[in-house]
């Protein structure tokens, strides 16, 4: 502790208390100055002393502070490392869960589609020859529906998902908590028409059922491709293997990543034709930068993975 002194001057502080002649504290002026005006004479004043305490840090406290700071930093570093390990473990578990779901659904849907095609045409062969027109129509609608789904997805993405259905699609533009997100509901919704078309085409004969069967196959093929490219390659929800090295698919992934940056007002809204959309709005330069960034990131991840395994 240290004491300090401070002073203050007050004029006539005791004027009312000591106004009697016996305790007059006024300064006596010499007679030579009595002729001056009263305004020029000295006034009465008092000096007040206030004792002020100042707290000083002791040497012991100053010596202990660096040790406590270093220990706190060590605890913080250990806590952050623990949190990072937990986050990586959770991400690994989520990717494994989604990979199992993707593989099972893809295998199941593909197997059912192949069996449906085989049994449908073999069932029709029992009653006679297969109509070439019906077979061609089934094949044409399969390709046409797969291509048409790209344009449907582009329109729905812009006019519905980023508009009236944004409350559901917003989960796809935020950090995901867990292996699934609310946006995955759209995949289930799109599976409904495919199941209906396949069922009607399988259990009925004729050209129209054959066309419906082909359309259902096309929607199914597009859904599987969309899942592996969009969920696996772009957002890395599960490993996709060698398709990450396909140049055009790498370009597709980079284009969709620019959609999430919102640099071109959400363009591209499509997936497989996303690079074409970016070209129309002058986004080729940004697309090339994103492709280079993804290549570097992929090589870095591959290098770290191989070093850790060795």
From Swiss-Prot:
It comes from the Eukaryota. A motif (Histidine box-3) lies at residues 230-235. One of its GO terms (cellular component) is chloroplast membrane. A motif (Histidine box-4) lies at residues 256-260. Residues 1-51 form a transit peptide. Pfam families: FA_hydroxylase. The chain crosses the membrane at residues 98-118, 132-152, 183-203, 208-228. It is an enzyme of class 1 (oxidoreductase). Signal peptide: none annotated. Homodimer. This is Beta-carotene 3-hydroxylase 1, chloroplastic. The gene is BETA-OHASE 1.
